[in-house]
């Protein structure tokens, strides 16, 4: 199927309803033999490395728990360098750069604004001209999201939206894809200034859950912006949330505060806790 045909199909497909149904199915307990056979088939199809998983297949009673599985302790050591920025996830770099007057690159010839992404022009202003990167999490990847630097969680924004796929065809053809899909933004104050960790939903990514509060997306609730009155500390590498299936994370920093490593290029594979940049 070519990209144009795929996009036309996605245009008419009831993506939100499909994601709801898939999400419900992943949370349903089913007979263990059937469930374990399905998980094993999924792991084989997507080349999931269960040697890295905290537990074996038998430990996960639902697909949702399998998707959000933890890693074996110590498997992803976090670079403790004082000025080191670490990857918040396991994934592959889709784009990376420094925003040009608040504009970021989605794909060749397609840009979006930080204002659109965060849904709040005031919240977006501090990130104009700053470092940003987009990291894609495939179905085989570890689906939890962590802090790239230590600091405090200052608030979050839940922005309801659509459920377009975030595969290459959509990224190359859907204008402002990451700004129309549902997302959950976590705001941090770090040693490198303000940081936004944007978790973007997608088709069949039924929910995004925060680790620091009772926040779950795609539950029929309206959008919400919340600022914490007291500091909520988070260490570098501390868990911020999780996807029920893979999707995309976008990091935003203030200008002249973070410089990306030369190795952080488009299509580069990144691992949680590994260095991707430095504080300047």
Curated annotation (Swiss-Prot):
Subcellular location: Cell membrane
Residue ranges the record marks as coiled coil: none
Membrane topology: Peripheral membrane protein
Active site positions, chain numbering: 90, 146, 247
Main location: membrane
EC number(s) reported in the record: 4.1.1.65
Cofactor field: pyruvate
GO BP annotation list: phosphatidylethanolamine biosynthetic process
Catalytic activity: a 1,2-diacyl-sn-glycero-3-phospho-L-serine + H(+) = a 1,2-diacyl-sn-glycero-3-phosphoethanolamine + CO2
Pathway assigned in UniProt: Phospholipid metabolism; phosphatidylethanolamine biosynthesis; phosphatidylethanolamine from CDP-diacylglycerol: step 2/2
Modified residues (Pyruvic acid (Ser)): 247
Domain of life, per lineage: Bacteria
Keyword Membrane on entry: yes
Keywords: Cell membrane, Decarboxylase, Lipid biosynthesis, Lipid metabolism, Lyase, Membrane, Phospholipid biosynthesis, Phospholipid metabolism, Pyruvate, Zymogen
Keyword Ubl conjugation: no
First-level EC class: lyase
Annotated site residue numbers, Cleavage (non-hydrolytic): 246-247
Single GO term (MF): phosphatidylserine decarboxylase activity
Entry's cofactor comment: Binds 1 pyruvoyl group covalently per subunit.
UniProt PTM: Is synthesized initially as an inactive proenzyme. Formation of the active enzyme involves a self-maturation process in which the active site pyruvoyl group is generated from an internal serine residue via an autocatalytic post-translational modification. Two non-identical subunits are generated from the proenzyme in this reaction, and the pyruvate is formed at the N-terminus of the alpha chain, which is derived from the carboxyl end of the proenzyme.
Pfam families listed in its UniProt record: PS_Dcarbxylase
Cellular component, GO annotation: plasma membrane
Family statement: Belongs to the phosphatidylserine decarboxylase family. PSD-B subfamily. Prokaryotic type I sub-subfamily.
Biological role: Catalyzes the formation of phosphatidylethanolamine (PtdEtn) from phosphatidylserine (PtdSer).
SUBUNIT field: Heterodimer of a large membrane-associated beta subunit and a small pyruvoyl-containing alpha subunit.
Name of protein: Phosphatidylserine decarboxylase proenzyme
Upper classification of the organism: Bacteria, Pseudomonadati, Myxococcota, Myxococcia, Myxococcales
Gene name, Swiss-Prot/TrEMBL: psd
């Amino acid at each position: 199927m070519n990209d144009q045909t795929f996009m036309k199909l996605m245009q008419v497909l009831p993506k939100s309803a499909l994601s709801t149904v898939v999400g419900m199915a992943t949370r349903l307990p089913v007979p263990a033999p059937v469930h374990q056979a399905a998980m094993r088939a999924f792991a084989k199809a997507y080349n999931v490395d269960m040697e890295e998983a905290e537990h074996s297949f038998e430990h996960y009673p639902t697909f949702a728990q399998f998707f959000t599985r933890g890693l074996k302790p110590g498997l992803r050591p976090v670079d403790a360098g004082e000025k080191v920025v670490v990857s918040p996830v396991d994934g592959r770099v889709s784009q990376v750069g420094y925003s040009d007057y608040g504009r970021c690159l989605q794909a060749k010839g397609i840009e979006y604004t930080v204002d659109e992404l965060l849904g709040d022009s005031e919240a977006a202003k501090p990130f104009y001209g700053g470092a940003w990167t987009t990291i894609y999490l495939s179905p085989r990847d570890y689906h939890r999201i962590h802090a790239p630097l230590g600091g405090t969680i200052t608030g979050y924004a839940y922005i309801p939206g659509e459920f377009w796929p975030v595969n290459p065809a959509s990224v190359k053809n859907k204008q402002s894809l990451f700004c129309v899909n549902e997302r959950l933004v976590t705001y941090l104050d770090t040693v490198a200034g303000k940081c936004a960790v944007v978790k973007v939903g997608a088709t069949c990514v039924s929910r995004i859950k925060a680790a620091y509060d009772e926040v779950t997306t795609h539950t029929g609730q309206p959008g919400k912006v919340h600022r914490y009155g007291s500091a909520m500390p988070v260490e570098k590498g501390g868990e911020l949330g999780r996807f029920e299936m893979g999707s995309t994370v976008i990091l935003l920093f203030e200008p002249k505060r973070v410089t990306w490593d030369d190795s952080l290029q488009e299509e580069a594979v990144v691992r949680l806790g590994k260095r991707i940049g430095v504080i300047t």
